Amino acid sequence: MATSNDIRATFLNYFARNGHEVVDSSPLVPRNDPTLLFVNSGMVQFKNVFTGQERRPYSRATTSQKCVRAGGKHNDLDNVGYTARHHTFFEMLGNFSFGDYFKEQAITHAWNVVTREFGLPAEKLLVTVYQDDDDAARLWKSIAGLPEERIIRIASSDNFWRMGDTGPCGPCSEIFYDHGPSIPGGPPGSPDEDGDRFIEIWNLVFMQYEEGPPGTRVNLPRPSIDTGMGLERLAAVLQGKHDNYDTDTLRALIVASAEATGQDPDGPHKTSHRVVADHLRSTSFLMADGVLPSNEGRGYVLRRIMRRAMRHAHLMGMTEPLLYRLVPALVRQMGAAYGELVQAQSLITETLRLEETRFKAMLDRGLAMLSDEVGKLGEGQTLSGDVAFKLYDTYGFPLDLTQDALREQGRAVDVAGFDAAMTEQRRRARAAWSGSGDAAQEGVWFEIRDRVGGTEFLGYSTEKAEAEIIALVANGALTETAPAGTEVAVVLNQTPFYGESGGQVGDTGIITGPNGLRIIISDTQKKLGDVFVHLGRVESGLAQIGQPVEVVVDHQRRSAIRAHHSATHLLHEALRRRLGTHVAQKGSLNAPDRLRFDVSQPTPITRDDLAVVEAEVNALIRQNSPVNTRLMTPEQAVAEGAMALFGEKYGDEVRVVSMGAPVEEGKPAYSIELCGGTHVGRTGDIGLFRITGESAVSAGVRRIEAVTGEAALAQIAEAERRLQETASLLRVAPGDVTTRVASLLEERKKLEAQLADAQRKLATGGAADKVEEVGGVKLAARNLGDVAPKELKGLAEAIARQLESGVVALVSTAEGKASVVVGVTADLTSRFDAVTLVRAASAAVGGKGGGGRPDMAQAGGPDAAQADAALQAVRDAMAA
């Protein structure tokens, strides 16, 4: 039996032998198309080639493209697990011709692949063509020898493909496999076409027209070919299955899920196993391609998929995280074809574990609430949109998760009500924002750009320039003039000032002009991409529209910012080399006094790893190698090994910054990144690099803080001063501070143990002599002062043993707070409840409740001064 890996290799090898370039799958996040959530077909990475905006060094290509359909226009999430052929993740095999061959050769290749390479019987195949595409019908007859009755003309738009409202378009031809009369269903175009007998396996798109304004269409000068064949569907046919989930790759994941959960893969939880198998693939590949769970955009779609799988794990009785345990099974199945999966395995595993652990408590509470609400519904009633929104807003339940849970009970959600609740929340948020005054000012920047255009940036080559004031904004509105004392936003026709973007803070400096004009600039922002807004205060003179001015950037501050920005590039590459290529930038700040760099990394970065990274960056600084910048197309940059931020939209030309001597074959520099910021001339200009902190930002994201140059020297000097001061206090040499502190800590530990032992003996000694009676019951009530709260329970148990029968109430006032423990001997728990007594004590010290068992409970409160009142409250409660 041909495995999925065999099928993929056979397909690609055939087209490689026939003059096609084998192109790697693009990442699931489109490199240069923020309008598309995820790559959902093989042609996405070639979109600009088809439209003529990009040229490649080949005119024929073949790929096995990773695809995700979840969220947005193409969303299969709700159906996954319940049907034989819906997936959030799938692979699309395809061959492409960019103005090279057309219909005849495309049909020839397709027929050769399905009948010769894969050995499908010709009598089991039929095709569809667009109703007017006589050429395709004729070619299928002559090349494949198909009779007329197995060439079906389709009049619907299903067999005519368009890239958009305008642009390349053309008829399609689809190849179908016939499973035979024992399977229900009719041929395409028939009333029973949705049955499983006839399955589409390959779609050939003949791009031969250019769609213009409505009603206009012209022939393309260079017709092209775009084809797509789902690997999972083809595998089902070749492996003799009617269900994609029974094919080798997905079945292996289902079996792994069954082994981990102890649930029969084909039993009552069959659907849940299928959901877990599919969602494991989509979540893992998305994370391997740089997407991490969050509450917005692509990250939120990823989180929705994860949480749907987590609910199905819950349905199978899993009380511990499941998905992360299945990652090795996925890597075994698909790691050979997709190396990025292997490289990101630790990131995927840890992120899944963290997400599952954190969502578990919310899932339990949310499902309990959902169960309560459903219990209030009558037969056939839908769940209100307000309740569904509360589940979303409070417990993190995406709407589709709630719908999925109700679907199993034959119920639905009032989606319109949910949407209304969501709209109302957004309306309130907008109202709060617009009330701040920011909204009113945003419109000004659109008006400025429409009226006078953007600003030309000169800051890569100079820090000083002549310019003209083209717009002034004061108090949120356009103005013609700005006198001395005015807080003003100045827009110039050109500027050397860098506007805050890409993590680099904006420049500061001075604008001067005729008649004593002097404006102190405290910040520079970039609006709408190319409107540079200089924020400052008119110190003297009168600023006017059309006025010629001289602008000068604060050189010392800019130099410090440049050093920090260049250091982040070296840091990024050093982290990837030390921790793995799963490390990707998730955010940054490059300021004059520090840098902050957020990266995808599932676990804390160890002190040893940080030391290695810091040393490597400093070695690169000492190289004093030149920092080079070049302009090229995004595709050229990526081909050279430049790192780009997935999901960012880049123009036709990008700025590529490279630095450091190369250490990797085929890569011309140590670090190569797409970057629009300002940088040092040589790595030596950074001076010194020092990591100051490492912490968590969110699940799967770590933050590194560091300083460079003079800021690093200042910090080292401060650390040295503190070390000398500490050594002086300890009366040892600086080199002996660590040994002396360790010795003191050990001495303290021994003294604390001795003190606790003395307090324990003091508290329990002579218990019988210090016992009072309340209603004929013995009570040992004591204020123990600074005794550690953690000691109270053990002391209460010891005193209770001495009493044999009675109640113990102990209060500690350590650390300025009251801690209370109440114990009741077993023979009295039918008369006195320790929880009730401790809650009375808690109220006296300003606490809110308390908890425990009938024989032992504890509580606390902020008012340590009322410790004796707490003991009296216990007496009163016993006497009541």
Swiss-Prot record:
Which sequence ranges form a coiled-coil region, renumbered to this chain? Answer: none
Pfam families in the record? DHHA1, tRNA-synt_2c, tRNA_SAD
Q: Which GO terms describe its biological process?
A: alanyl-tRNA aminoacylation; negative regulation of DNA-templated transcription
Required co-factors: Zn(2+)
- E.C. number: 6.1.1.7
* A GO molecular function held by the record: zinc ion binding
Where does this polypeptide localize? Cytoplasm
Q: Does the keyword ATP-binding apply?
A: yes
Q: Which GO terms describe its cellular component?
A: cytosol
User: Cell division: is it a keyword of this entry?
Assistant: no
Q: What class of enzyme is it?
A: ligase
Q: For Zn(2+), which residues are the binding ones? A: 565, 569, 675, 679
Q: How is the cofactor bound?
A: Binds 1 zinc ion per subunit.
Superkingdom classification of source: Bacteria
InterPro entries, per the entry:
aa-tRNA-synth_II/BPL/LPL, Ala-tRNA-lgiase_IIc, Ala-tRNA-ligase_IIc_anticod-bd, Ala-tRNA-synth_IIc_core, Ala-tRNA-synth_IIc_N, Ala-tRNA_ligase, Ala_tRNA_ligase_euk/bac, DHHA1_dom
Per UniProt, the keywords (alphabetical) are: Aminoacyl-tRNA synthetase, ATP-binding, Cytoplasm, Ligase, Metal-binding, Nucleotide-binding, Protein biosynthesis, RNA-binding, tRNA-binding, Zinc
Q: Which transformation does this protein catalyse, written as a reaction?
A: tRNA(Ala) + L-alanine + ATP = L-alanyl-tRNA(Ala) + AMP + diphosphate
Q: What does this protein do?
A: Catalyzes the attachment of alanine to tRNA(Ala) in a two-step reaction: alanine is first activated by ATP to form Ala-AMP and then transferred to the acceptor end of tRNA(Ala). Also edits incorrectly charged Ser-tRNA(Ala) and Gly-tRNA(Ala) via its editing domain.
Return the domain comment text from this UniProt entry: Consists of three domains; the N-terminal catalytic domain, the editing domain and the C-terminal C-Ala domain. The editing domain removes incorrectly charged amino acids, while the C-Ala domain, along with tRNA(Ala), serves as a bridge to cooperatively bring together the editing and aminoacylation centers thus stimulating deacylation of misacylated tRNAs.
Q: Which family does it belong to?
A: Belongs to the class-II aminoacyl-tRNA synthetase family.
HAMAP family for the chain:
Ala_tRNA_synth_B
Tell me what this protein is called: Alanine--tRNA ligase
Q: From what organism does this protein derive?
A: Granulibacter bethesdensis (strain ATCC BAA-1260 / CGDNIH1)
Report the gene name: alaS
